[in-house]
């Protein structure tokens, strides 16, 4: 009889455990097809799991597919960039006067689609022009894009090369707009179009005078590249922040409080270091995320 009771109690506890596991709220996170998105999704997933959520991550998504999946309720949470939402999803071409204005605008526009922008991070993964280390030493006076343009004009006969990824070089709001804003006159002899990853290789090997980069890319520090100030404010702001479906936030309002301190921990330099651990040191995104959460303990919120 005692054995029967023990078995029944054991079965009851087991079923209770299954029930508790089944009761964990599910959050479906999406990530686009580049390192930073994978790292952010992994950090968020591990953090939410530690706070009682069941999390599934779908990675390798294109921008349009990821957005469509979230708008149609197939994904619950994405780390999004204000400039992407403004231009690509909401088709607003006018430049906002500040990062805060950009955030406020996309928060308003996306709310109409049932999407809520939570507290933004402290990093912006926007475009920039950078110099290789040797060029930076040879031209210490070049700290801004305007100063770069002065050198390119003064030394036009030397046909200095500028590396750009193919997409940026051919977009109307890319190279053409940059040249118009800064009064640049880069011809075919000056431009080298290539895959975005090869731009960093060309810069590292000092094969070009300057190149287009992303401000939170881990290779900036690893390759000792010098970022130039966008002194005429051409490049739009791409502040990152978690965007969640309103229906999910209404069901689990503690998510806003839970994700706020995570966003506070993420600035430009932190993201460069995290991205470098994957792209340069070849660590897995999951191990990078786990190490980050160990080094930056965040408070728990019971769902």
PLM region spans:
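Short, well-ordered beta-strand elements
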Residues: 23-36, 54-58, 157-164
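An extracytoplasmic/periplasmic, membrane-proximal ligand-sensing/linker region
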Residues: 36, 169-184, 253-303
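Short, polar/charged alpha-helical segment
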Residues: 35-54, 70, 177-180
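A bilobed periplasmic-binding-protein/Venus flytrap-type ligand-binding module shared by bacterial periplasmic
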Residues: 127-137, 239-252
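Ligand-binding "clamshell"
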Residues: 89-118, 205-207, 219-233
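A conserved helix-loop-strand patch within extracytoplasmic ligand-binding domains
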Residues: 101-161, 264-268
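Ligand-binding pocket segment of bilobal, Venus flytrap-like solute-binding proteins
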Residues: 156-230
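Short helix-initiation/N-cap motifs at beta->coil->alpha
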Residues: 35, 56-68, 187-201
């Amino acid at each position: 009889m005692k054995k029967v009771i023990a078995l029944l109690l054991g079965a009851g506890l087991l079923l209770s455990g299954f029930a508790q596991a089944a009761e964990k709220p599910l959050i479906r996170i999406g990530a686009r097809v580049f390192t930073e998105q994978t790292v952010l999704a992994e950090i968020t997933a591990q953090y939410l799991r530690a706070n009682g959520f069941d999390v599934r991550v779908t990675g390798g998504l294109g921008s349009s597919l990821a957005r469509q999946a979230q708008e149609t309720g197939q994904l619950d949470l994405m780390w999004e960039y204000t400039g992407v939402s403004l231009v690509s999803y909401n088709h607003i071409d006018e430049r906002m006067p500040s990062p805060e204005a950009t955030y406020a605008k996309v928060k308003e526009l996306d709310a109409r689609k049932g999407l809520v922008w939570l507290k933004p991070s402290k990093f912006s993964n926007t475009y920039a022009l950078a110099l290789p280390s040797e060029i930076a030493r040879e031209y210490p006076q070049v700290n801004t894009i305007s100063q770069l343009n002065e050198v390119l004009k003064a030394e036009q006969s030397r046909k200095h090369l500028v590396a750009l990824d193919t997409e940026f070089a051919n977009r109307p709001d890319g190279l053409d707009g940059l040249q118009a804003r800064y009064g640049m006159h880069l011809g075919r002899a000056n431009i080298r179009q290539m895959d975005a990853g090869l731009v960093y290789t060309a810069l590292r090997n000092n094969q070009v005078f300057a190149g287009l980069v992303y401000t939170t890319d881990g290779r900036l520090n690893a390759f000792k590249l010098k970022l130039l100030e966008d002194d005429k404010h051409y490049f739009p702001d791409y502040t990152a922040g978690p965007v969640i479906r309103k229906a999910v936030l209404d069901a689990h309002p503690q998510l806003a409080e839970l994700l706020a301190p995570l966003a506070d921990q993420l600035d430009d330099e932190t993201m460069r270091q995290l991205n470098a651990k994957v792209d340069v040191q070849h660590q897995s995104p999951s191990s990078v995320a786990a190490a980050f959460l160990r080094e930056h303990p965040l408070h728990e919120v019971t769902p």
